[in-house]
Amino acid sequence: MSKQPSLSYKDAGVDIDAGEALVERIKSVAKRTARPEVMGGLGGFGALCEIPAGYKQPVLVSGTDGVGTKLRLALNLNKHDSIGQDLVAMCVNDLVVCGAEPLFFLDYYATGKLNVDVAATVVTGIGAGCELAGCSLVGGETAEMPGMYEGEDYDLAGFCVGVVEKAEIIDGSKVATGDALIALPSSGPHSNGYSLIRKIIEVSGADIETVQLDGKPLTELLMAPTRIYVKPLLKLIKDTGAVKAMAHITGGGLLDNIPRVLPKGAQAVVDVASWNRPAVFDWLQEKGNVDETEMHRVLNCGVGMVICVAQEHVEVALNTLRDAGEQPWVIGQIAAAAEGAAQVELKNLKAH
């Protein structure tokens, strides 16, 4: 008879009971997000969802994303309540720019040692994000992987599927010289540029838990959840039919994201003096001595979404967005690009 002790999965660092406890904790979160098209609840091998009624030629649109190294900041600050909304926002905002209505969302949560309370807090934030976007949280994967992550550190990925009528796909092909560009404000850096942000914090030696900007703690400004623009934008599309293109301003800022939806030969001329940049960006620029162009190439600088409409539709677009609770403004317009010119020109860049 072997004297070797009998090993269990728990001995290897994987707690099946903790995983099952988490599933029970988050069932109510998923239930709150349920859409009528979703068939069944959590726990099956695959999540089933019907195409909503009323579509003639439905096209499915998919996206996946993470939250970058904002997660490291969340772990350092032990603040996990809003990172789930960030995850949803990064996915659904990418879907809505082509006119799609998000249908369902799945998440992947990987960790070295599962902390059920932390994971439940994260998933509750995912559920809140799904409610804001009008999509169902239909499932996910929680992977406890000892030896792959340090302690209770975790990583997140999100996956979303939406639907759009084929004839109503928004792809930027109708963008024309003279069209207006409308901006929607961000809540802060959203979920991009955090490797630079963390480097600035490190180099400056700033205690971000004591710094206040405009009467708010810097940590609150840096961890503000990414805004979810789905419902106001779907209302704008449905009520006006005026939207020619939209760009979700993520990593790469205005300079890299607007060109993704512009046709060849079009240039976006953006007036950076058309809005007051939130104080958090000025603090980051000052503490990191960051070049002005680099700021706009890495961070959103206060702009979370850019919408292109014809000039004659500017007022109705602005009013529709305001009625939906947004604070839009005209940020620039479309011009004909000169030979070899960049597809985005930033006017009134301040000297740094």
Swiss-Prot record:
Keywords: ATP-binding, Cytoplasm, Ligase, Nucleotide-binding, Purine biosynthesis. Coiled coil: none annotated. It catalyses: 2-formamido-N(1)-(5-O-phospho-beta-D-ribosyl)acetamidine + ATP = 5-amino-1-(5-phospho-beta-D-ribosyl)imidazole + ADP + phosphate + H(+). GO terms for cellular component: cytosol. GO terms for biological process: 'de novo' IMP biosynthetic process; adenine biosynthetic process. Pfam families: AIRS, AIRS_C. It comes from the Bacteria. It is found in: Cytoplasm. Its EC number is 6.3.3.1. Belongs to the AIR synthase family. This is Phosphoribosylformylglycinamidine cyclo-ligase. It comes from Pseudomonas fluorescens (strain Pf0-1). The gene is purM.
